Amino acid sequence: MKASRFFIGTLKEAPADAEIVSHKLMVRAGMIRRVAGGIYNYLPVGLRSIRKVEAIVREEMNRAGAIELLMPAVQPAELWQESGRWEQYGPELLRFKDRKQNEFVIGPTHEEVVTDIARNQIKSYRQMPVNFYQIQTKFRDEIRPRFGVMRGREFIMKDAYSFDKDHESLKESYKKMYDAYVRIFTRIGLEFRPVAADNGSIGGSGSHEFHVIADTGEDAIAYCPTSDFAANVEAAEALPLLASRAAPAEAMQKVATPGKAKCEAVAELMGIPLERTIKSIVLATDNEGAEPTVWLLMLRGDHDLNEIKTAKLPGLAGYRFATEAEIVEWFGTPPGYLGPIGTKKPVRVVADRTVANMSDFVVGANEVDYHIAGVNWGRDLPEPVIADIRNVKAGDPSPDGKGVLDICRGIEVGHVFQLGTKYSDAMGATFIDESGKAQPMVMGCYGIGVTRILGAAIEQNFDDKGIIWPEAIAPFEVVLCPMGYDRSDAVREAADKLYADLAAAGIDVILDDRGERPGVMFADWELIGVPHRLVIGERGLKDGKIEYQGRRDAEATLLPADSAATAVAEKVRAALAR
């Protein structure tokens, strides 16, 4: 490729709405341009990197035995109504009517369509296992699209769907996809972690997310530095921080805490650690034709409620936070001084595992400006229902028993789910088993955010000059920067020969023949992030030398002109082989 025949749309400044590094650099490097909120044009530089990501994904999916197909972006409402997600999905599902007033959606995922394919095409257990995948544009009408391709409304995704005869077979299909994802992200050159995760709106039983580690990541990841354990903070099990409950050492007493409605303020006033205070959270579950059931959840003062874990507790599916009027009705006081002792009406108490092992703790007195200290289970309160209802924190014991947890930020770029029979049951996707009986197909689904990978890779790989691409997905592997290409026959001939030799060696090379000043050339290619640069100048050629600099190198080095192509080709191959 010659730069004079390519489109290079670099900018000196990032747009005002670009908040994170990847968004700023993708615009400045001429990779993307905004069309509407969360919708982008992918310019030639950006598209080249997208195609390289897609090629790696496609190779590894094929290697894992998946079969490529292509499903429509536009899907009939009937399929979504059949699965039940027409009502469950929120406004991020873009719905519209055609000229005949038939309802359709633009697909955010394709579980319904692929299940429709399977129920019409797969009849026998002999046709399974099978795994279909596609690389296609999706649309989710995000309420606040931001961060460029990291949270866009339209994006490119690889989604795959496996169909098995039973759950044991699904586990094998799931493992193949898990391993394929590890290979994909390793080949791309990302620092990543697979983490145990919650299935969310997709449904099913087990799942893992694949996160690129980056300070700008939206997700908090709990991991153990001394083991392989990693999980989304929302899914990580929080073990009790006390091995057992100590015997009471204090008498229960009411304490004046004027104006101290927060645990931190109470602890400071009483001169005790925050860890001895209790945070009370009031939830409600509605009962048709009757008053709601009110719940009091008790957490240690320095802990936060995990809403996903809470929703999985018996009786708490579909819970909501109680209104202030309900709190006053059940506790006799507004929020800030709530506790389990002396409630106005009966409430159901759930204590976090750590709280259940505490002694001599402080709770609200259900009276404004008062708390109760020296509270103990069994003596002052009946034994509670105990559950894991909090988020883990750095320093907590790792659930695998092999150390303590640390917390980092991650950008989710892939997710694998064991769906089970959620969709096949709803949509009647059955097959005939070995005994001649109809059984629901057991499904898995597996997604990779192709365009999001670009943003995540940049968040891990940049400096003050621009992008530093992982070798495998750089738009070009090598750039040739001739000094005076249009003025010097020697420079032009040497550059053309280098270009031909590198291209013949299978290297993705671009020759900058635009006639730009050296500073402009260097700034453009450092911004775009090409991993290897060769500078050809008359002075160096007189000494038989060409200047080489890797994008990550602090200084340039000189290479013999007659072997420079071979040397750089070897550097590229070595980097790709890592």
UniProtKB/Swiss-Prot annotation:
Catalyzes the attachment of proline to tRNA(Pro) in a two-step reaction: proline is first activated by ATP to form Pro-AMP and then transferred to the acceptor end of tRNA(Pro). As ProRS can inadvertently accommodate and process non-cognate amino acids such as alanine and cysteine, to avoid such errors it has two additional distinct editing activities against alanine. One activity is designated as 'pretransfer' editing and involves the tRNA(Pro)-independent hydrolysis of activated Ala-AMP. InterPro entries: aa-tRNA-synt_IIb, aa-tRNA-synth_II, aa-tRNA-synth_II/BPL/LPL, Anticodon-bd, Anticodon-bd_dom_sf, Pro-tRNA-ligase_IIa, Pro-tRNA-synth_IIa_bac-type, Pro-tRNA-Synthase_IIa_type1. This is Proline--tRNA ligase. It is an enzyme of class 6 (ligase). GO terms for biological process: prolyl-tRNA aminoacylation. GO terms for molecular function: aminoacyl-tRNA deacylase activity; ATP binding; proline-tRNA ligase activity. Its main location: cytoplasm. Homodimer. The keyword Cytoplasm applies. Pfam families: HGTP_anticodon, tRNA-synt_2b, tRNA_edit. NCBIfam families: PRK09194.1, proS_fam_II. Belongs to the class-II aminoacyl-tRNA synthetase family. ProS type 1 subfamily. It catalyses: tRNA(Pro) + L-proline + ATP = L-prolyl-tRNA(Pro) + AMP + diphosphate. GO terms for cellular component: cytosol. It is found in: Cytoplasm. Consists of three domains: the N-terminal catalytic domain, the editing domain and the C-terminal anticodon-binding domain. The gene is proS. CDD domains: ProRS-INS, ProRS_anticodon_short, ProRS_core_prok. It comes from Burkholderia thailandensis (strain ATCC 700388 / DSM 13276 / CCUG 48851 / CIP 106301 / E264). Its EC number is 6.1.1.15. Keywords: Aminoacyl-tRNA synthetase, ATP-binding, Cytoplasm, Ligase, Nucleotide-binding, Protein biosynthesis.
